[in-house]
Amino acid sequence: MANVALLQGKKVLVTGAARGLGRDFAQAFAEAGAEVVMADILSDLVQQEAQALQKQGLNVQAVTVDLANADSIENAVAKSVDVLQGLDGLVNCAALATNVGGKNMIDYDPELWDRVMNINVKGTWLISKACVPHLKQSAAGKIINVASDTALWGAPNLMAYVASKGAIVAMTRSMARELGQSNICVNTLSPGLTLVEATEYVPQERHDLYVNGRAIQRQQLPQDLNGTALYLLSDLSSFVTGQNIPVNGGFVFN
């Protein structure tokens, strides 16, 4: 159970919240006292997961969002803000991550490249843009963009995903410069290879590479990221912005 007081009264929107890291984040934030809206393109699943958390007494709701569709993004943000009656934090966890690797740069599908960039980079920008007016009304707005440590070590045979996450790190810094005057902190969280649905297709040798290369030699679990995410959303990080924090057991050092 997270520290109940850490996010007490905070209103948070989490994308990609139907499963994986986003689902775990939503639960951790709600356990820490936040009111949470879980957003995902998987409409039925995100509703089911929200209902499961509600049965645990947590304050969560669900909305549908398609990061490849600007109208869907605007509608999801408007509905979320209406439900929450404000917005203090946005966690951009949604991404196209499944079955996007396995081919080298020569053989990579240009259409898949465009899809990855459209969702992972443009979609993150558009939903952040839609949330900014509401975050400005918060005493201390926070945005967490979930990237990946693959962009830090240059993972092979995963070019579009790696490039998209590198763009997220760079975009975060630019956003932090622009939004600092509104007291909005923008930071990047870069997980290592984590045991979630989206990584089930990853070959065992890549899992072994991570485990053997980490300072803490074990598999990474979704809950390993919760503490850092809670910190970045809380008032404890009110003077931290533009930073990329790798949480990967020491596979890549900053």
Q: Positions of the model-derived regions?
A:
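Short C-terminal tail/terminal secondary-structure segment
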Residues: 2-3, 97, 102, 153, ...
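Canonical Rossmann dinucleotide-binding motif of NAD(H)/NADP(H)-dependent dehydrogenases/reductases
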Residues: 4-37, 175
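Active-site helix of classical SDR
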Residues: 128, 164, 172
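C-terminal helical subdomain
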Residues: 188, 211-236, 240, 249
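Alpha-helical segment proximal to the catalytic Tyr-Lys
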Residues: 133, 177-181, 238
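Residue(s) in the substrate-gating loop at a strand-loop-helix junction
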Residues: 148
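Substrate-binding pocket helix/loop in short-chain dehydrogenase/reductase
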Residues: 101-105, 109-114, 199, 206, ...
